[in-house]
């Protein structure tokens, strides 16, 4: 069974969760417990060290890896600045690069993301860039020092599932780096599908946070991700356009 290691850390639970859109910060601790997640993303604007009641960090256990994102950055320079601020605030060396200048579809800018990845990786950050799935961009991100890449399944927050499945599959097949499917996953079955094709992990936020019961939805996603990974490792049987009986069709009445 393959291990998922990012930045020298073994990640045993392949479901990453986000911290936005919940009805309150207090529920996040229960979601983390239900999901079993070891990694949580957060936007810096939700970290308030001067107000413990509003500070999201008060609800995240110390053993959970913080993955601050550069939400709000529209170019590489802004992403780099946000990442440095996150580290200075004590959020650690992990960073999820988000560079988005498109306000309608919220698609990441791969070129600016590559630039930011290079600078931050050289500064010792564990860089996980959010990207539009593309084999060539993935290769360049690896060359720039990315620890993993995070291609979108569908536009962020859309809950539309794996609309980019074939492109993600190509990246999984061709790139020797963890591929973490991020954005667009709306159902546990869609997370399972991503894991079945060989994704190293899934990041889910909106589908959990916007459900009527986020804690149980987190549990459902945990089981889906585990099941999908197990199916991938078990090497599923090939598809066929013809029927193939599972029981003998001859000999019994001869």
Curated annotation (Swiss-Prot):
Biological-process GO terms, alphabetical: thiamine diphosphate biosynthetic process
Primary localization class, coarse: cytoplasm
SUPFAM superfamilies, sorted: ThiG-like
Record-level Gene Ontology MF annotations: thiazole synthase activity
Listed EC numbers: 2.8.1.10
Matching InterPro entries: Aldolase_TIM, Thiazole_synthase_ThiG, ThiG
Pathway membership: Cofactor biosynthesis; thiamine diphosphate biosynthesis
Cell membrane is among the record's keywords: no
Pfam families membership: ThiG
UniProt family annotation: Belongs to the ThiG family.
Role summary: Catalyzes the rearrangement of 1-deoxy-D-xylulose 5-phosphate (DXP) to produce the thiazole phosphate moiety of thiamine. Sulfur is provided by the thiocarboxylate moiety of the carrier protein ThiS. In vitro, sulfur can be provided by H(2)S.
Name under which the protein is recorded: Thiazole synthase
């Amino acid at each position: 069974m393959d291990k998922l290691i990012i930045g020298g850390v073994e990640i045993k639970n392949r479901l990453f969760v986000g911290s936005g859109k919940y009805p309150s910060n207090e529920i996040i601790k229960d979601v983390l417990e239900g999901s079993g997640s070891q990694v949580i993303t957060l936007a810096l604007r939700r970290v308030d060290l001067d107000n413990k009641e509003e500070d999201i960090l008060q609800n995240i256990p110390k053993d959970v890896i913080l993955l601050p994102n550069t939400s709000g950055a529209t170019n590489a320079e802004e992403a780099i600045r946000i990442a440095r601020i996150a580290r200075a605030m004590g959020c650690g060396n992990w960073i999820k690069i988000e560079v988005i200048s498109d306000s309608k579809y919220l698609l990441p800018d791969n070129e600016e993301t590559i630039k930011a990845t290079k600078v931050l990786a050289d500064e010792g950050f564990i860089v996980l860039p959010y990207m539009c799935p593309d084999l060539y961009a993935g290769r360049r991100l690896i060359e720039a020092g990315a620890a993993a890449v995070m291609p979108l399944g569908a536009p962020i927050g859309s809950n539309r599932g794996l609309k980019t499945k074939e492109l993600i599959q190509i990246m999984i097949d061709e790139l020797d780096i963890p591929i973490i499917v991020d954005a667009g996953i709306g159902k546990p079955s869609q997370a399972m599908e991503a894991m079945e094709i060989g994704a190293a992990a899934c990041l889910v936020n909106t589908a959990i946070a916007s459900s009527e019961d986020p804690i149980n939805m987190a549990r459902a996603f945990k089981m889906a991700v585990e099941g999908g990974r197990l199916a991938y490792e078990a090497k599923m049987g090939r598809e066929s356009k013809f029927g193939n009986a599972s029981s003998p069709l001859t000999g019994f009445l001869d």
